[in-house]
């Protein structure tokens, strides 16, 4: 289903501008010719204009300018490393990799690197199915090309700094031509240095690679939330050391990183888990178990493997974290659908529920449904024309939890004007429209079945309550 981003973004949605001081300037003469013509003569006037061409100190793999770290910046960087080590209680095993950009260069890198990985991240037809799925869930009406452009813009504008799980490089935009990092830049670097330290100790590259090989990112949201919350905590502690004047100065230094188009609000729903619920959970962990307890949770992959990582449900509801409540395995039958074949399948997590429901029924009701999740599974089917059929099966922790999940999906369907009518069908509610959605519960599971072709749902009438 959803492929999560490779990059750990420090989503501190901020506004700012970048300085463009000129350094390392070379001179080059350029001839500009202007020709004027009359009936009698032709006169050619040649003028020589001197333009300044700045030679970059270095460029990255995409030819984007990198900025040099001055000796004073390196001293600041090392001081920030020491601060992060003291707060996290771990030491860097090697000097962190880093790239410093201008603000514009950093935004360009985010967009270009996403597009460069795009073909590798999606198999043939997979992107089109992913966008069609979001259309059928009512999240968007965008075409695959439009959605690609929107996500590229989201990548371009959504972060103030980043740490990449795979190449392990910390990337931060700074003002050009300065000898020292300003306070805002130092604050962002503290956040990203925390991620770099995590990368050196918690095998984050390894667990991401394992998820990618399995083509299953269901374990990603929970561990991502803990990583972001730890980085946020260390960053806040660094900012707490500033006096009122320095804090005001830091706020004035925030660059103008803004999106050029209005992005769908549901793009930001995972960030609510990472940057709102995550810090709430980490605050409880620190109160009960100190930083040692948080590090132990982040060490789980290294010590116990992928299936031990915290779930999104544990982040939404801290009580489930401390009891290590896990998702149940939910078996879902493969259906025989004429002219369709099974193309993909996987598990459903709490973030998936909130992701689909929140924009329609609100944060509170969708989160209540998510924290009552027992477990879930889904299967996708496709025909030769790329049409999609989706089946979902969900259990609750209790009968009441299951009812809340069912009620949330019914509410989700009822508030959408894309459905022409709703009828009782095969023990459930059938919402008819361009996408047809069947929702039912038998007291043990909630089932959803989505198809663009109503005849497919009708042909599955005897199977809908048993898959």
List each language-model region with its residue ranges.
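C-terminal motif of bacterial Sec signal peptides marking the signal peptidase cleavage site
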Residues: 12-15
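Bacterial lipoprotein signal-peptidase II cleavage site
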Residues: 17-25
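Extracellular mucin-like PTS domains
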Residues: 25-51
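Post-HExxH zinc-binding segment in Zn-dependent metallohydrolases
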Residues: 80, 200-205, 209-253
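Catalytic zinc-binding patch centered on the HExxH motif and its immediate surroundings
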Residues: 106-128, 143-170
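Short pre-active-site segment immediately N-terminal to the catalytic Zn-binding motif
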Residues: 170-190, 222
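Pan-zinc metallopeptidase signature
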Residues: 262-393
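C-terminal soluble interaction/assembly domains
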Residues: 386-467
């Amino acid at each position: 289903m959803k492929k999560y981003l490779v990059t750990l973004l420090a989503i501190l949605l901020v506004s700012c501008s970048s300085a463009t001081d000129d350094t390392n300037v070379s001179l080059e003469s350029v001839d500009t010719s202007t020709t004027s013509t009359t009936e009698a003569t032709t006169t050619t006037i040649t003028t020589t204009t001197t333009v300044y061409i700045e030679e970059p100190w270095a460029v990255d793999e995409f030819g984007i300018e990198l900025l040099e770290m001055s000796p004073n910046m390196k001293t600041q960087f090392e001081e920030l490393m020491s601060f992060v080590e003291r707060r996290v209680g771990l030491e860097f095993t090697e000097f962190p990799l880093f790239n410093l950009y201008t603000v514009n260069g950093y935004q360009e890198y985010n967009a270009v690197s996403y597009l460069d990985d795009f073909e590798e991240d999606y198999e043939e037809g997979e992107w089109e199915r992913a966008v069609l799925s979001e259309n059928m869930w009512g999240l968007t009406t965008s075409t695959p090309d439009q959605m690609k452009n929107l996500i590229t813009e989201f990548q371009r504008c959504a972060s103030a700094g980043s740490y990449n799980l795979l190449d392990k490089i910390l990337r931060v935009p700074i003002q050009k031509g300065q000898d020292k990092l300003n306070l805002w830049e130092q604050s962002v670097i503290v956040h990203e240095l925390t991620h770099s330290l995590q990368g050196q100790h918690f095998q984050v590259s390894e667990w991401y690679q394992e998820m990618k090989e399995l083509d299953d990112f269901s374990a990603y949201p929970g561990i991502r939330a803990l990583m972001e919350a730890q980085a946020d905590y260390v960053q806040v502690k660094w900012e707490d050391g500033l006096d009122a004047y320095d804090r005001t100065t830091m706020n004035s230094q925030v660059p103008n990183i803004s999106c050029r188009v209005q992005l769908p609000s549901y793009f930001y729903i995972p960030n609510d888990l990472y940057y709102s619920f995550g810090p709430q959970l980490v605050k409880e962990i620190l109160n009960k178990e100190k930083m040692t307890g948080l590090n132990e949770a982040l060490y789980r992959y290294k010590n116990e493997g992928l299936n031990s990582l915290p779930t999104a449900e544990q982040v939404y509801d801290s009580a489930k974290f401390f009891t290590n409540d896990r998702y149940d395995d939910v078996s879902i039958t493969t259906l025989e659908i004429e002219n369709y074949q099974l193309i993909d399948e996987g598990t459903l997590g709490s973030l998936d529920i909130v992701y689909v429901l929140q924009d329609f029924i609100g944060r509170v009701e969708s989160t209540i449904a998510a924290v009552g999740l027992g477990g879930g599974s889904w299967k996708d089917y496709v025909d030769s024309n790329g049409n999609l059929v989706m089946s979902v099966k969900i259990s609750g922790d209790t009968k009441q939890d299951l009812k809340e999940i069912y009620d949330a999906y019914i509410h989700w369907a009822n508030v959408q004007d894309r459905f022409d009518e709703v009828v009782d069908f095969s023990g459930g509610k059938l919402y008819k429209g361009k996408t047809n959605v069947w929702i039912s519960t038998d007291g043990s599971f909630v089932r959803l079945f989505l198809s663009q072709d109503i005849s497919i749902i009708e042909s599955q009438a005897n199977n809908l309550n048993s898959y």
